[in-house]
Amino acid sequence: MSEELQPVFSIERLYVKDLSLEVPHAPQIFLEQGEPEVEMRVSTGSQKLEDGYYNVDVTVTVTAKLDNERTMFLNEVTQSGIFRLENIPEEDADLLLGVACPNILFPYAREAVSGTVTRAGFPPVLLAPINFEAIYQQQQEAEAAGA
């Protein structure tokens, strides 16, 4: 009787690949009044490292501006993880790398943004959860339309 190989999905390591904060108008910006406009951009990516091991990145860029022109701060974090995937069909692996892994990484990126911004002297930035499944579906549809 042949032994069926069990699927493996595990987190091997979580780490901050890149973290930067710019406060271009300090210290004057701290004296200005007004409610900042906060813009967030998120991107994801993955790469195969070796058999069964993948690196996944979630990059979050947060920009806060006063009066839609003066930048209060620009914060960027790339939260990464090394994941082990074995005995998983390719289409399922793509879904894990595009949805499950970013869902695991995003709370760490969110905490890094909030902590960095707070340590810079600003009120914390609370980022809303991201629907990585919807983003993945949009990417799949765009690739299918382009093929």
Curated annotation (Swiss-Prot):
Gene3D superfamilies: SecB-like
Gene Ontology MF term list: unfolded protein binding
Keyword set includes Translocase: no
GO cellular component, one term: cytoplasm
Keyword Chaperone tagged: yes
BP-aspect Gene Ontology terms: protein folding; protein tetramerization; protein transport
Keywords: Chaperone, Cytoplasm, Protein transport, Translocation, Transport
Pfam families in alphabetical order: SecB
Highest taxon above the source species: Bacteria
Subcellular location: Cytoplasm
Oligomer status and interactors: Homotetramer, a dimer of dimers. One homotetramer interacts with 1 SecA dimer.
Entry's family note: Belongs to the SecB family.
HAMAP family documented for this protein: SecB
NCBIfam families with a match to the protein in the record: PRK05751.1-5, secB
Function: One of the proteins required for the normal export of preproteins out of the cell cytoplasm. It is a molecular chaperone that binds to a subset of precursor proteins, maintaining them in a translocation-competent state. It also specifically binds to its receptor SecA.
Name used for this protein in its record: Protein-export protein SecB
Species in which this protein is naturally found: Neisseria meningitidis serogroup B (strain ATCC BAA-335 / MC58)
Gene this protein is translated from: secB
